[in-house]
Every structure is written in C-alpha cells, then in structure tokens.
Amino acid sequence: MLRVFIFFVFLGSGLTGRIKPQVTCKYFISENNTWYKYNVTILNSSIILPAYNTIPSNAAGISCTCHDIDYLQKNNISIHYNTSILKTFQDIRIIRCGMKNISEIAGGFGKELKFLDLRYNDLQVIDYNILRKLIRSNTPTYLYYNNLMCGKRNCPLYYFLLKQEQTYLKRLPQFFLRRISFSNNNTYLYHFLSCGNKPGHEFLEYQTKYCRTKFPEINITVNQLIAKKNTERYKSCYPLVFISILCSCISFLFLFICLLRSICKKYSCTKQDKSSHNYIPLIPSYTFSLKKHRHPETAVVEDHTTSANSPIVYIPTTEEKKVSCSRRK
C-alpha cells in the first residue's frame, strides 16, 4: 500500500513538472485599432514582458493574460517587466499574472492612461497616489480579486479612500469596494471584504481607526501630502487670480475718475449758469449811478459810498449804440 502511494506521488509530481503555464500577450497598435500577439518569455518561473525596443513606437497599449496560473501564487509564478514600456500606453491589461506590488510600475503610468485592468493578480499593496490619479481622471480601473493587506503599508490607501469616498469613488464601479479582496495576517479571504468583515464605508472606518491607533504618523503624512497637492493645484490659478484682481482695480479706478470728472463738470456748469444770469460787479462794495445830462458814451459813474469821485468809463452795449446813433440823426 505504501509503495502504491509513493508511485502516485511521483507520478503526480512528474505530471505537474511537465505542465507549463500558458501566457498570451498582445500589444495594441493605434493605427488600425487591432491587437497583435507577442511571445512572452517564461524563465525560472518568471514571466518576462517584452522589452521596450521590441514593441513598435506607435503601440498604444499592452494586454497580457496568463492562463493556468493560480492567483494564489501556488505555482510560484511572478512577473517582471520593463516599466519604460508603460509610459506611453493608453491601455494596460495584465490579468492573472501574479503581480504582487503595483507600486513597481508606478513610474510607468503616464497621463495618457485611459484603461487599467489588473484583475486576478496577487496585489498586496496599492500606492494611493496612483489610485488618486486614476480616480480623479475618471480612468476605468479594475483591481478586484486581488489580495490587499490590512497592514501599515496600505494605511495611506484607506485614509485616501475614506477622505475621497463621497467625491471620487462614485466615478468607479460599485464593485470596486465590494469585490476587491483583502487579507489579514496572511489569511486569504476572497470575493468579499475581510479585515473585520465590514463592507464599504464601515470597513474604511474600521481600517482608518486601526491605522490611527497603531500608526498615527501615517495619518499626519497623508494629510500633509493631500494638502500639499491641493496647494500645488491652486498655485496654477494664482496668475489668473492676480490678473483678475489687477483688472478689477483698474476698472474701479477708471470708474472713480469718471465719477469725479462728472461731479466737477456738473459743479462748473452751475457756476457758469449763475454768472450768465446774475451780474457780479468787479467792485461789489461800490454803488453806481449814471448822470442823466451826460451822453451814455461819455457817461461818468459817481461813487456815493466814498467822498472821492473816481470816473469810470462806461462801455455801452450794441443796442445803446444804435439808440444813440438814431438820436444824432
């Protein structure tokens, strides 16, 4: 009986040794909108993605699906890649390939990324900065059926998700928080939220409370980083704010000058109207009278307020000149 058992053990080990995981990788060419297959190397139980110089420069994405690879890493299959090939891609799909850490390809994510699918891997840590960029850019992101840890390294992620839950998580599918998998103390629990068996918002509150208790310095760091990012985002608006304030000051000054000019003009006009209708003598303290026996052209005005006579030549008007001329005739 023991010999039969040993025989089947050796037979099973031999068969499993002969089975090699199948890997299919394709890259996307943007010109004709088609996917092309590409051979992927498997070396020492490691999947090697194509090198940068072997992919066309106009490639817009990459798709790599690993078949017959257990995402629990029972086959001890890991994936290695050149991050430089991901910088210009708009579409990244690496499924069932046993990736453990998404932060390794963080440098490869560019602003052009419009689709990210990393399902059925063994992701244990996600950099919240990557997730923040994907959420705010409304990029379709598929991360469920992974294995996020409930330890210190994911505390920034939980802080960010709780802080941005009402604003940004609405843009992602509902299964993002419902079907993503978490692990606690290396006990893998899939297809639902573990770490206390609390779904959604309650789970985030539970995790953030745990992180604040155990690692309070991480909470301060994350808040500072978020505040710093918001400040940097507002700094881009500073020139526009300065220009708007300057324009407002100039317009206010212009209106003030116009108002001042209108007031001054109105005041000067009323003064001219008064002078045109009311005679203001040059010497207001004097009273004048004309002698009747004198001619108007040579009339002498006597001053009755003083003892001295100061003859002032009276200049007749045009009508008086006409009257005097008619009398002479």
Curated annotation (Swiss-Prot):
Membrane-topology annotation of the record: Single-pass type I membrane protein
UniProt-listed InterPro entries: LRR_dom_sf
Keywords of this entry: Disulfide bond, Glycoprotein, Host endoplasmic reticulum, Host Golgi apparatus, Host membrane, Host-virus interaction, Inhibition of host innate immune response by virus, Inhibition of host TLR pathway by virus, Late protein, Leucine-rich repeat, Membrane, Signal, Transmembrane, Transmembrane helix, Viral immunoevasion
Residue numbers on the Cytoplasmic membrane side: 261-329
Residues the record marks as carrying a glycan: 32, 39, 44, 76, 82, 101, 185, 219
First and last residues of every LRR repeat: 112-133
Modification(s) after translation: Highly glycosylated.
Domain remark text: Contains putative leucine-rich repeats (LRR) and a C-terminus cysteine-rich capping motif similar to domain structure of host TLR3.
Protein name: Transmembrane protein I329L
Provenance organism: African swine fever virus (strain Badajoz 1971 Vero-adapted) (Ba71V)
